[in-house]
Structures are given as structure tokens and as C-alpha cells.
Amino acid sequence: MKEEETIEISEKEKDKERNDNQDTLTISWIEDWRNEETATKNENNKNNNSDGDSDDDDYYDDDEEIKNSRYNLFLEKILTLESNSNLKNILSLNINFKKDNKKSKETDTAATTTTTTTTTTTTTTTTTPTATANKKYIRTNNLLNNNNSSSSSSSNNNNNNNNNNNNNNNNNNNNNNNNNNNNNNNNNNNNNNNNNNNNNNNGENITYITSPLSNESLESTEECCFFLVHLPITKDLIFNQFTCLLIHLFQIEYNNTIIINNATSSSSVNSLNRSYNNSNNNNNNNYNSYNNRGNNYNNNNQQQQQQQNPNLKIRDLEGYQDCSHLKKLCLTIHDYLTQLLQRNPLIWYDSIINWSLSTLTIITRLLIILKNNKSQQQQQQQQQQQQQQQQQQQQQQQTKNKTQFPPPPPPPLRQPITPISAMVRERLDFYSFRSLLSLVLHLTRIFSIETFIEKSNVTQFLDITSKSSSSSSSSSSSSSSSSSSSSSSSSSSSSSKTIKPKKLPIYELGWILCHLGKKNPSLILGLTFNHYLKNIGLNSNNNNNKVNSKSQYIQDINCFQILEFLALQPSSYLSIIFQQHIDKIISNHKSNKNKNNTQFLKDIKTFLMLITKDDVFLSIGLPIILDKLSPFGINQFDNNNNNNNNNNNNNNNNNNNNNNNNNNNNNNNNNNNNNNNNNNKNNNNNSIKEDNSSEKDIESIKEILEKVLLGNSQVISFYSKRILLVLYHCCFGDSNDITFSSYSTSTLLQIKNQTRYNVSIKLLTSIVKDRLEKQLINKLYSPILNNNNNNNNNNNNNNNNNNNNNNNNNNNNNNNNNQQQQQQSQEIENSTFINNLNQDENITFYLNQIQCNNNNNNNNNNNNNNNNKLIKEKNNIIIKLISLIGMDSIYSSLIILNHIISKLKSNQFIQYFYTLVEQFQAVNSNTIEFFINDLFKSIDSFSHDDLITLLNNLLELVKITPPPSSSSPSNLSIYNETLKCISSNWVVLLKLIKHPNLIESNKMMSIEILYHSFNNRYNNNNNNSQSIQQLEISNNNNNIKKKEIYPSTLLSDKEMLEIRVLLEKILNLIFKSFKEKNSFERLKKFEIYKNLYLLICNGSSVYFSSTIDLILDSLFSKKTDMIIKLPILCALSPANTLPPPNYPANLVNAGSGSGNFGNGDDDDDEYGDDEYGANRNEKEELYFKQIINPSLPLSQPLIMLPMQSSLLEINYERKYYHYKFNDMNNPNHIPFTNKPKNLKKRIENNQSSAIDTTNNNNKNNEILTYKKQRMKKKKQSIQQNGNINNEQQQEEDDNDDADDQNEQDDYEKYNILNNENDLQSFIKSLVLYDGGGGSGFNNHGDINDRLQILTNQFLLRVSSPYLEPSYENYQEILPKQSHYERDIFIRNLFQQNPFLYRVLEIISIDGRELTKCLEVIKSLLVNEISYWYQCRNSYSESPIKSSHYHTTILLVKALINAEFIIHPLNLSLELFDKIKAEEISYILTSIWNFIKDYQPNPSQYQSSSSSSSSSSPPSNNTIIPTFKRVFSNCNTTPYSLTLKAIFHNHIKELCFHYARFFPKKYY
């Protein structure tokens, strides 16, 4: 009953399957016949199935109904084959055996539970190998799981059921049934099913087919042939049965080769595994824990046995190892079909050729699948072996402490299997191939080759689209393996729904055309061009980027066999054929009305694919195709043919190149045709866009380049430049309108074919990346390896001479030397491609192709964006090519970097700079250093525009820091190295300020570059370099601790000296910036120089000391006249440079300025414009020697210098100078301003070195223009009013001159005041600068140290050696003038250099430091008291007009900041502009008395908490004291009486301020 139920279920499933497949694969007459014979068919099936265990041979028993109708019996046999869904997939040529994961898991689990098989007539069970051979069904099984299904086929149905029940019981009771070995083995099979499913999901299903005709006699085959002729209605089904027979024969032949190759390895593994299983089962009776471990290991053992022996005998094919019977059957079929062709070829030609081509296609694809499965299987075996070893180690560790038994030994490793690729080459040895190929060759004898290709519709069969690939993948998913009837029927029904009818099958015609080409090469050459090879590129076009096994099979094997007969032809014959073929392609393209570019591209691709298979073809065909495709002639771009020929070492290539030149001369007439061709392509760009097939055509070009231009051929390297030019032209240009030399952005906007452009970009990237990079790596690194290997070989040879037992090593070394020589020869050949490109002309050509983005603000923003994308993609290709060329040599890399920095914009330059330098540094680590040094050496060779772009790019490069998140560490290292190299070339950057090619607005760019280079070098968080301040601290710490000083962490003496010189240069530029007439330019330059100086100095005490020394020396020199101070007739030297009594003062002043500050480049510039030039110093020495040591008589005059003051003038100046001191008590005296006009002009002329000539010229020009305008007005007035008295006119002229002089003096004083403020802010910034240490402006330790240095330098120049008066001495003379020598020296020194008051104001930040200057302050205060007392009548109304007013304010400010005075005296500054001069002297006297009574002491000062809490930096106008003075028992009442009296005298003006000065106290 169970058997009948299974039969009924199978019949219902078959009916559903037939109904589902009516629209796809069934034939109309078969469906009608089924409806008529349904009753008889069901009765026969029931009678046959009622016998139970009857074999399939009972189907052929002598039954009365079957004997009476052999016609029905024959149809029944055929229908059993036709009803199977798996065969339908095969016959529909949809063989892609990748299965779905879900379906594979379901079928695999079903295979473990039931192993029944069904057919259309009976369900049988087999017990012997001969029984399995009688199966008339198709079975789908996984190659990796063959052994799982073999156990089910070797037992009866009852035994299978019993075994399945036992398996389920054993799964629950593993520990109780340890003695039963068979049950344990069954458990292992069940336990491994899930593992096998998981491991084999990626495998491919292989369909094993057994034909019903396999066990039949020759009579049944002849009967089929008979019905093929006499019953044409069954023709297709009979052909399908013949196909099944040939496939069966092929499977047996292939299986026999596997068994022969792997017989030894498989037998040894089986024997070892069996012995190991017995040993494990004997040990299972001892301990339960070890028993469980043994069961687990049995599972692993069985799984490993199945994985290591996948190529054992296939159970489905066991009865057919002797295939002689099948060969006889195939021979009869072959003879009978040839007879049919001979009788009536017109009727049978199409049907037989279609059948033969489809059968060949099936067999070739099955062979490819076997090859792919073999490679996948080997990979899975290695992975599983590693997993098993890990599991064994874990189990050993777990059971080590529990059991006393040693762990079982690991199973033996299997020997490697011979690869199937070796058998693929011998596939023609199979009889199935030979029979079908002989049949096809017989067809070509009957008809010609042309008719054969036309009949086979090659162009249609090879037109592979994405639809066909998708249908094949969907149909293949349904061919999963199953053993039960339910699983097989469900899979077949699901597959039938996904299968769609195909109008045009796809045949494998490669081998057929190969054999036809060997027979008739002259005829097949053109046919393969036009019909076959042009479509091979489409086979490799896969939109999903998956490997197409068919295309790989064709290009690896078939193309080589096609060329076997072509290689025998002479070169002259081939060149004629190639040229004629290209001309034919062009003529066909012109004659085509539709101008189909796709066909033209396919033809070109065919030609290129053919010539790449041999160097002889390349040398002949490549020049032809380049001349036809390129719009330029060969002579224009191949000027270096002789040089390139010298690089080639093969004589064959030289001969071929000569032939190429001859052929190219013959082909010059065809260039016009090609130009017209390209015009047609450009005119039809829009039509190509609309055509979907254009994408395939463009992809075919990609395949051309991958197969042709990326091949390892020396001939290609000879034409490397021309190939890249043709590709570049295809990407970006038109042949008629564009030349490479005059290429612009406007032409790029005309590119309309976006798809062609995109693919061309990909093509150029592929050739640049794959071709150039590999050859460059071989060229760069192979010589080093070869030298090392040669040294090692020499050492080995010397050792072998001493040892006679090392002959084998000598032989190995000789072999290695031979291999290395071969590698060297190959690398030399490959390097020619790079050498031809690495030339100055080629490099500059590719660099000129880099374009800038269009930033025009037009309405069409989308067009601009698209054009910018095109430009970016183009530039990326060129940059990639240029980078590979630059990696070949350091010279070419410098050319590339110098070009991009002077031609590109900043955004593009920064992007390309990092990419190029990163690749160049991989070859040469000193690329940046060489580039920066070479750039600054050749800075004068750049034009104006290039120099500006260069500076802009450098500024952006130094300013923009690569972000750490988006940039790689290599970019940061490149950035830091660039900063270091630029900052070290500060000499060139400073000289660029005076560069003649730069305009005034761009001269400060070099200073900005220098500033950002130092700033980012020391302040960059990602930089490991230390700042100058940190290095100085580390120097001091190491010196104190007496440790070793490492040069890697500390600055060397040379670097310290260079920085000192750089600071001196910048300070010189700061003083020169004070001379600018334009206030805005002056402030701009001053701020730039100041920030740069502060950055480089970086708070270092060493550099601060040198800076203060330079500033103070410059203050006392003539270089700061009219900059910081007014010019002096006879200047007084500071205390540290007192001259001898008779030494001229001019020499002192000149020496003081030139000693420290006058060593820069400005001295040379200033003296270079004099009349006597460089001889000035020598004449001055002679002049001063005559004065000091007179050797000539008094009657003889001295040698006078031009523009030099005479002795009379010098004596007069001295007298005038002493007169000032003698008449100092005169209130009307204005020091240093009441000098004669002529003398002042003469002094100004003599002191021209201190005055900028440009500023004076500008001022003089303004004065002259003003005078000219005034003279014009006078002439006009004279003409109107007549003559005027000469006396009146002279008086007016004198008044005008006086007004002009006053205006000029006021302007000079205003500039001097501004310069003093700027210089004070600069010194104050130096004192308060934190140095980037992160502690703000409150780092009081560093500030106090710098203030101490400033105080010491100040006192060194101000403190005189004269005696110091006491307070009692001053009390006797006040408020009169003091005539003590010390006071006179200090008074005159401060009057000549009023900036010293500002220095005191800076020192007053720390009151402790100002206490050191108390003697100077006393002297200054006494002088100011006496002055205001003397001039009490002259400046009684307005004290502001006095020249001492400003100095008095500065002095009192210093006292207030240092807290030398207390409230209300510290508010007295507010009254100075509102009271009389006499009252000012009274207030100063009160201040004097307070300082006398409460003398300041450093111990009275304590640190200021308010200043430490403030985080904002001080401004330039205010100074925050760092220490506060603590007054104890201070009574201010006696000192405030003077202020109260002044308030009473000015009650109306000062009443509003009284409350602040004298606040009311509340008790």
C-alpha cells in the first residue's frame, strides 16, 4: 500500500510539472498524445509497480500490450527522458550550476532522511552495481557529497528504512550503544549532514546523466535511427536521447581519468581511516567521557574522509567503466547521420548541425564546471583541515587531565591531487568530442565554410546579453541535488517556473573554428575576423563584475589555436592581410548609412586581439592600427626612433620596425579617411548615447586595452608614447580641430559623448596602473636584489671550493644564476616602456595637459560642474601617468614638481603635490629637500606670473595643515618636512622682498611664507619637533645636570647662529618699515615683521638678550635719525662706549651703529649709491688718522672728504653744543631744534645714510609741486595787478619757506611719535610673549627673566662712571638746575634719545627691576623739577607746548606703574594739562620728597593675584604690573598739601576731581 501511495504521489507531481512546462519546453503533438494514452499508461504503471521489488529489466519483459505496440514503447522511452526537469535545463543550454543556499539546505536535509528514487514508470531499489546502471533517470548530486548518497544506493528499501530508524535512535542514545560500530557510523553520517550543508553551499551541482539507450543493444539504437527518418515527428526527442548518450559517455571517460590519477592516494586513505575507526571503537568501552570524545572524533573522521576523497568512484556510473559498448552506439549514430547528410543534405543539414553544436556546448560547459569545482574543493579542504586541527587541539586540552589514554593520532594527510587543468588540454582524447567534431567537419565537406558559418548564425549565437546571463543563473538555481521524490518534484516545479524560452541558443564554436582554420587558413582568416573574434569581447563583459568561465575558456585556449596556422604565414603576407582588413573596416564604416560606430569598434577590437597573440603580429600590426586611429602621422611623434631602437636588444624587433616604416609610408594616404571617420563619430555622439548597445561597444574597447596594451611585449614599449597619445586623444579631443599643443578648456566643453569619455578614462587608468607600475617596480627594486644575490652566490662558490661535499649546492647556485640572468633580461626589456616616456619632451607635454577648473560665474552652473568633473578626471589620469614617470628618476621628479608649483592654482597644486611627493618619496626619501633647494636656487629664472603663482602655492602649502582625521600619516610627514626645508631657506625668502619681478603688493608674500613655515613647524600639534624655547630649556637642563647632549633633540651651534643672523635681518627690516611714507603700508609691514620676529624668537632668553642689545645700539646710532629721534649735531655716546678725550665724535657714532647693527645687506645698498663707492672706508680712515696723529705741517691743508664737515664747522658744532649746556637755565632754550637752517641742511645731507632716499625724493617732489603751483598763482596775480615791489615779494617768499619748513617738521615729529609707539609695542611684546607654551601671558617666570635682561642692558648704557649725589646735595640746589656731571650726562642722553623714557615704562612692569634704576630716576626727576621751575613764566598758560611735557608724563607713568608713589600722588597726571608750569614743579617736588622718605626696596614687592587671575593679554597702551608694593605706616597727608593748594587755586576747573583725589572716609 505504501508503494502504491508513493506511485500516485509521484504521478500527481509529474502531471503538475507537465502542466507548468507546457509554455516552455513541451511540444504540441506530445501533449495531444498524452491525453489519448493516459488510461493505458496508468494501468501499465500500476501493474509494473505492484511487483514491489522488481528491477528495471522488467520494463522490457515480454508483455502482450507492449509487443503489440512497439511504437508506443518507443515513445514511452523517449517520454521518460523528456519529462525530467533537470534534463530540460541542460538541453536548453542553461548550464550554470550555482545553487541557492536555501534550496540546497532543504535538499541536503531531505537526502539524509529518505533515499528513494522515482521514475515515470517504476520505483526500483538496487542492490548491485549492475542494477544502478539500469537507472533511466537523471540524478543531480553535489560533487563534494558523492559519498553521502552512495550509502543509500547500496541497500534495499527495507534496509534503508531500518537504517534511518536506527540513526534516529542512536542520535538520542549515543552513550548507551557504544559497542555497535555500524550504528556509530550511521550516527556520524547524520551528525555530519549539517556541517556538510554549511561547508558546501558555495559548491556547484554536477548533473550525472544515464541514457535509456546505455544498456540497450545496437538494435534499439538502430531502431531510434530508423524512427528518426520514418517518423520525423519524433526527431527532436531522438536527438535529445542521442545527446544524453554522448553526455553519459563523456562522464564515464572523465571519471576514468580521475580514478586512474588518484587510485593510490584514495586507497591509502581508505585503509588508514578504517584502521583508525576500529581503534577508536575499541577504546569507547572504557570511559564515558572518552566515549563522547570518540564519537565526536568519528564525526570528524567521517567528514574528513568525505572531504579528502571526493574523486572516488561515482555510484551512478559504476556499471559503465567499460565504455566500449557506448562507443559502438555512438559510432552507429555517427555513421547513420553521415548517411543522412549524403542522401539529402538540404533537409538534414540544419537539424544535424544544431544538434551537434548544442551537444558540444553542453559537454564543454560540463568540463569547465568540473574544473572550477576541483579548484573550489581544494580550497575548502585546506580550510577544513585547519579547523579540524584546531578542534583536535582543544579536545586534547580538555581530556588531558580526565583520562589516562593518549589522544588519538591525527588522520594522515592526503597527497595532492593532479590538477584538472592538465586534463583540459587533453579533452580531444575523449571519444565524445572526436565524434561530434568529425561530424561537423563532415558538414563542412558537404558545404563550404562560408555556408557553414551562415547556417550556424554565429553572430546571433555569440550575441550575449545580460538577459541571457540572468536567465541562466535563475535556471541553474533550480538544479539542486535531491534524493527523495518529493524534493525532486518540488525543485523541478520551482525551476520550471523560472525558465523562460530562449529564441537563440548560445553555442561554443571555438574548437570548431580552430579545426576549420587548420584545414583552410587563407579562407578562415577573414571569416574569423568578421564573424567570431569581433564578438569574443562581449563574452567577457559582465555587468556584475563576475568571472565568466566561458569567456575565460575562449581567450585562454581558442585564440591560441586560431593563431597556430597564422604563425606559419610569412610576415609580408600578414602585413598585406592586416592592411587590407583595416581598409575594409574603414570602407564598410563609410558605406554604412546609419554610421554605426559599434560595428566599427568591434572590428578594430578583433584586429587588436589577434595581433597581441604573438610579437611578430604586434610588430607588423601595431603601427598600422596606430596610423589608422591616430590623426597624426608617425613622423611627428616618433622623432626618436633611432634612440628607441638602440634600447631594444632583439634583432627581430629592429627588422620589424624597418618594415613598419615602409608600411607606414604606404599608409599616409589613408589618414584623411580616418579623419572623416572621427568626424562621423563626433557627429553621431548623441545617437550613440541613445543607443543602449553603445555601452557594450565602449566596454569592448576596455577589453582591447586590457588584452593588447597591457600585455608583456617589448614591441608595445617601443610604441608606448604613441599609444598613450592615441588614448589621450580618444578621451579629450577631436582630430580636425584640436592639436595637443594648442589644447584649451573651451575645446573640452565641446565633449558631448559622456559614456565614451568615461570609458576612455578607465582605459587610460588601467594602462597606466597595470602596465607602468609593475615595470617600474621591477626596474627600481630588482637591481638591488640582483646585487645581493650575486654577492651571496660568490660567497657560496668560495665555500664550495673548500668543501668537496657541496657539489649539489654549486649546481643549485648555477641554476639560480641562470634564472636571475633571465629575470634581468626581462626587466631590461620591460624598462624600455618607462625609458621612452622619461624624456624632457614627453614630461613637458603631459604636464601641459593639466588644466584648471572653470570658476566663471555663469548662469549655467550645471554645465560648469560637469566641465569641472571632466577636467578633474582628465587631470587625475595625467597626474597618475606623470607620477610613474617621475618615480623613474629624481631629475624627472624635480621637473614635474617645479612645473606644477609654478603653473597650477593653489587648490589643484596642494592636491597633486601630496599625491606626487608620496610616490616620489617611496623611491627617494630626499625628494622634498632636493625640490625645495632646487626651487629656490632657480627662483630668478621664473617669469612674473609664474613667480606669483609659485609664491601663492607655497603660501597655501605652508598655511594649510592637513587634518589628521582625513589625511594619512604620510601626508603629515610630507608637510612637516616641507616646513623644515622652507624655513631653512630663509635667506632666499628675505631677498625676494627686493626681487625685480615682483610688484610692491606681492613683495611681502615671502615673509608670510616664512612666518607660516616657522609657526606650523613649532606649533603644530602633530609635529614632533621642538620649539626654540623648548630646546633652550632642554639645553639648560642638560648643562645643569651634566648629562649627554644628543644632537637629535638639541639645536646645534650652527643652527643657533643661523637663527641669530635671521633675527638680525628681520630687525633691520623692522627699522626700515618705519621709513614708509604711507602709514597703512608702514603698519602692515611692521606687523608682519613683528609677528615673524616674535615667532622665531619664541620667548627665548638668548635671542631676547641679543634683540635688546641690537635695539639699544641702534637707538644711539645715526641709523635711527628721523625714525625714532631727530638728528643730532654732535651726539653723546652711551656709557658703555665712552671715547677717549681727543677722539672725534663722528667716528664714535659711526662705529656704534656699524658695530652690531650695520652688518646687514642695507649697508652695502646705502653706500653703493655714493660717488666714491667702496673707497669711502679707506678715505675715512686716512682722514681720522690725520686728526688723531697729525704727521703733516700745519701749513698744508688736510685731505678732505666730499660732503664732509670742515674743522671750523666741527669746532663750531662743539661750541654750539657747549653753549646749550651753559645756557640750559635759559627758559627760552629749546634743545636741539634752534640750529641754523644751512647747518641743518648740511647735517641732513651728511646723514643721508640714516634717511631713506625714496622717502626724501617723494617729499621733495611734493614740495616742488607745491612751489610750482604757488609760482603759477603769483604769475597770474602779477599779470593782473602789474608789477609789485621786490621787497614785498621777498617777504612773502620767506614766509612761505618758513611755513613749509614748519609743516615738514611737524610731519616728521608725527612720524617719529608713531614709530616710537610701534617700537615700544614690539619690545613689550618681546617681554610679555609666552612663546606658545600654552600658559598665556601670565608666565611670570619668563617675563621676569626678560625684564631683568632689559634692565641690565639699559643700565649698562645709562649708568655713568661719575659720582652719585646724595639727597642732601640735591636738597641744597632744588628747584634750581643741577650741574653735577652725572645729572648732566643723564639729562643730555635722555634728551638726545627720548625713547629711553619708554624703556623705563616697560621696566616698570616689575617694580623690583625699576628699583635698580632708582639713581637714574632721581637724576631725571631733578632735571624735570628744575626745568619746569625755570620755564614757569614762558609756559605758564599752556605747558603742553613744551618739549618736556611728554617726557615728564612718561617719567611719572613709570613711577606710578612701579608704585613708587601712592594715592593721591598717583593721580597727579590728570592735572598737568590744566595747571601752570610752576605748579607742575611743585607736584614733582612732592613726589621727590615722598620717594626720599619712602625709598623703594625689592623686598617690599609681592606677587599680584589679580594679574595671575587675568587670562587676557595686555594691550600695547597699558602695562599690568606683575608685583605690588606693600606700604607700611605710610602717611600721605604732608605730601598731599600741595595738591590741595592747587585745587583751591583752580576750584572752577578741578572741583569735579576733588572727590577722587581726597575721598571722604567713613568710620
From Swiss-Prot:
Signal peptide: none annotated. Residues 1-21, 31-44 have a biased composition (Basic and acidic residues). GO terms for biological process: RNA polymerase II transcription initiation surveillance; snRNA 3'-end processing. Keywords: Cytoplasm, Membrane, Nucleus, Transmembrane, Transmembrane helix. Residues 52-63, 1160-1172, 1289-1303 have a biased composition (Acidic residues). InterPro entries: INTS5, INTS5_C. It is found in: Nucleus; Cytoplasm; Nucleus membrane. Pfam families: INTS5_C. The chain crosses the membrane at residues 350-370, 877-897. It comes from the Eukaryota. The keyword Coiled coil does not apply. One of its GO terms (cellular component) is integrator complex. Belongs to the Integrator subunit 5 family. Component of the Integrator complex. The core complex associates with protein phosphatase 2A subunits, to form the Integrator-PP2A (INTAC) complex. This is Integrator complex subunit 5-like protein. It comes from Dictyostelium discoideum (Social amoeba). The lineage of its organism: Eukaryota, Amoebozoa, Evosea, Eumycetozoa, Dictyostelia.
